[in-house]
Amino acid sequence: MRKLALAAIQFYRYAISPLMANHCRFHPSCSCYAHEAISTHGLLRGGWLSLRRLGRCHPWNPGGYDPVPPIKTSRSSSMAE
């Protein structure tokens, strides 16, 4: 499923997005963010992060730099170090 979602995002980025003007208010763009989020966090969490990002991408949001959050490590593994 992850590969299918990433392929759909790639198709959008290279086939559909060039036909429209650049409307994303964020860096990286929403499609780049979605690709990175799903690649990093998996389909479920990455998909949720992508949907939240798309919800923030509107004319009343100032936008700006909004990177994909890093993977959270468990407390027990960081305490063992």
Swiss-Prot record:
The keyword DNA damage does not apply. It is a peripheral membrane protein. GO terms for cellular component: plasma membrane. Its main location: membrane. It is found in: Cell inner membrane. Keywords: Cell inner membrane, Cell membrane, Membrane. Residues 59-81 are annotated as: Disordered. InterPro entries: Membr_insert_effic_factor_YidD (IPR002696). Could be involved in insertion of integral membrane proteins into the membrane. Belongs to the UPF0161 family. This is Putative membrane protein insertion efficiency factor.
